[in-house]
UniProtKB/Swiss-Prot annotation:
It is found in: Cytoplasm. It comes from Nitrobacter winogradskyi (strain ATCC 25391 / DSM 10237 / CIP 104748 / NCIMB 11846 / Nb-255). Belongs to the chaperonin (HSP60) family. NCBIfam families: GroEL (TIGR02348), PRK00013.1 (NF000592), PRK12849.1 (NF009487), PRK12850.1 (NF009488), PRK12851.1 (NF009489), PRK14104.1 (NF010704). One of its GO terms (cellular component) is cytoplasm. ATP binds at T30, L31, G32, P33, K51, D87, G88, T89, T90, T91, G415, D496. This is Chaperonin GroEL 2. Its EC number is 5.6.1.7. Together with its co-chaperonin GroES, plays an essential role in assisting protein folding. The GroEL-GroES system forms a nano-cage that allows encapsulation of the non-native substrate proteins and provides a physical environment optimized to promote and accelerate protein folding. Keywords: ATP-binding, Chaperone, Cytoplasm, Isomerase, Nucleotide-binding.
């Protein structure tokens, strides 16, 4: 085990504070509509330009081990806020820096760190209660567009795209962001359920021009196993032919005699049929087939359930208004599943999302949820250069998470005003002793930091602006740093999702109070590089000449 370097008390906190300041100062220049860009060096390719707080925070590693520990703790604040609400990373970093700075002064003055922490916790509870009390529900498309615009640093085009996407796929629908190949940003919406499996044979194609299968009012057979022999399928095929409706077969695979017979029947025009492979693998495939069954009002045919293919009746098949299959994807639109069944399945998947610890599983579950709940929207972000596209994609990602958060918990005035107003409530908090009171006061002072920083980034005097905002009683009254005017921020469209502001203050206070109560720090000493061993002597030992 290598030797360690240990620092205590003021020494440790000073080093840690320096690290906190370096990271927070780099991140906070991006705050607000007039925030500046940060250029990040890449080991290969062009440098990356960003205004996204968490992206900047993730790039910072410091040489000094103790300073780096402080910086990494604050980086955790930004990451946690990004994970929970998808935005508010810079606000959280600014708050954490302000709380740590004031807290360290109080500890140095001899106050009890644990009482300070209790005071901070009391203050945060009061702030969260005040935010939820003043939160306004988001209902209209315009409000969603406003939230998206603010989070995308005032880019109204991004706000509009997000509002359109949410309108089309619903609040539960999946919105993915991709890089476009062109200059234009565009929105592409897939209605219904789509999975990434195409037709097994091109002979099933009905629309030769677009090379895809299009079937209206189709039956859907959902089978878990391979289909290779046709005998077990014959009774069902005859029943489908008599209805005159088309049939889509979703199975692990269709091969040999079964595939040949289906293709021949399709070409002769006796049976409108198409076959696709089942999506996913293993247990995930079973779950996805069950999703398709619930969406279409059918039953997944599985030997686990004791259902044999020869016993399948028309009632066990799913139905859909339209099925489209191309070379790579299958889309089922307007399945005939019962609304109550689909809602129950959605609730079940939501519960699994809450429980899972794996990010990959969560992503896959959210995809399944979206396919059941509404559909998938893809925003393709365009731009003139690769650097511009990447920077814009960052902002679209931020804005997408912010709009989701706004729909979930509502909105409050932006520009740091909601936290400023909450700071007024902290004057009424009753504490058990003076040190706890100081803890509350630390948070009260810190709550003005985001509004102050937004003003500073806009070239104004932060303290003057904070003073002017607090002079007015009106909750939504604040400073619009884009135009330099004061007024009602909600009616101006300057708004923040309540969830973003809430997670920012909770995460900032959580990490900051841990830093304040730190009394010792342990880091590895750098290894001394020993000189390389001398080269062995030349010649060929043991040889007689």
């Amino acid at each position: 085990m290598s030797a360690k370097d240990v620092k205590f008390g003021v020494d440790a906190r000073d080093k840690m504070l320096r690290g906190v300041d370096i990271l927070a100062n780099a991140v906070k220049v991006t705050l607000g509509p007039k925030g500046r860009n940060v250029v990040l060096e890449k080991s290969f390719g062009a440098p990356r330009i960003t205004k996204d707080g968490v992206t900047v925070a993730k790039e910072i590693e410091l040489d000094d081990k103790f300073e780096n520990m402080g910086a990494q703790m604050v980086r955790e604040v930004a990451s946690k806020s990004a994970d929970a609400a998808g935005d508010g990373t810079t606000t959280a970093t600014v708050l954490a820096q302000a709380i740590v700075k004031e807290g360290a002064k109080s500890v140095a003055a001899g106050m009890n760190p644990m009482d300070l922490k209790r005071g901070i916790d009391l203050a945060v509870e009061a702030v969260v209660a005040d935010l939820s009390r003043n939160s306004k529900k988001v209902t209209s498309n315009e409000e969603i567009a406003q939230v998206g615009t603010i989070s995308a640093n005032g880019d109204s085009e991004i706000g509009k795209f997000l509002a359109d996407a949410m309108k089309k796929v619903g609040n539960e629908g999946v919105i993915t962001v991709e890089e476009a190949k062109s200059l234009e940003t565009e929105l592409d919406v897939v209605e219904g359920m789509q999975f990434d499996r195409g037709y097994i044979s091109p002979y099933f194609v009905t629309n030769a021009e677009k090379m895809r299968v299009e079937m209206d009012d189709a039956y859907i057979l959902i089978n878990e196993k391979k289909l290779s022999s046709l005998n077990e399928l014959l009774p069902l095929l005859e029943a489908v032919v008599q209805t005159g409706k088309p049939l889509v077969i979703v199975a692990e695979d269709v091969e040999g005699e079964a595939l040949a017979t289906l293709v021949v029947n399709r070409l002769r025009g006796g049976l409108k049929v198409a076959a696709v492979k089942a999506p996913g693998f293993g247990d995930r495939r079973k779950a996805m087939l069950q999703d398709i069954a619930i969406l279409t009002g059918g039953q997944a045919i599985s030997e686990d359930l004791g259902i044999k293919l020869e016993n399948v009746t028309l009632q066990m098949l799913g139905r859909a208004k339209k099925v489209m299959i191309d070379k790579e994807n299958t889309t089922i639109v307007n399945g005939a599943g019962k609304k109550a069944d689909i809602e129950a399945r959605v609730a079940q998947i939501k519960a699994q999302i809450e429980e899972t610890t794996s990010d990959y599983d969560r992503e896959k579950l959210q995809e399944r949820l979206a396919k059941l709940a509404g559909g998938v929207a893809v925003i393709r972000v365009g731009g003139a250069t690769e650097v511009e596209v990447k920077e814009r994609k960052d902002r679209v990602d931020d804005a997408m998470h912010a709009t989701r958060a706004a729909v979930e918990e509502g909105i409050v005035p932006g520009g740091g005003v909601a936290l400023l107003r909450a700071s007024e409530q902290l004057k009424r908090i009753k504490t058990q002793n003076d040190d706890q009171k100081t803890g509350v006061e630390i948070v009260r002072k810190a709550l003005s930091a985001p509004a102050r920083q937004i003003a500073i980034n806009a070239g104004e005097d932060g303290s003057v602006i904070v003073g002017k905002i607090l002079e007015k009683e009106q909750y939504s009254y604040g400073f619009d740093s884009q135009t330099g005017d004061y007024g009602n921020l909600i009616s101006k469209g300057i708004i923040d999702p309540t969830k973003v502001v809430r997670t920012a203050i909770q995460n900032a206070a959580s990490v900051a109070s841990l830093l304040i109560t730190t009394e010792a720090m342990v880091a590895e000493l750098p290894k001394k590089n020993s000189p390389a061993p001398a080269m062995p002597g030349g010649g060929m030992g043991g040889m007689d000449f």
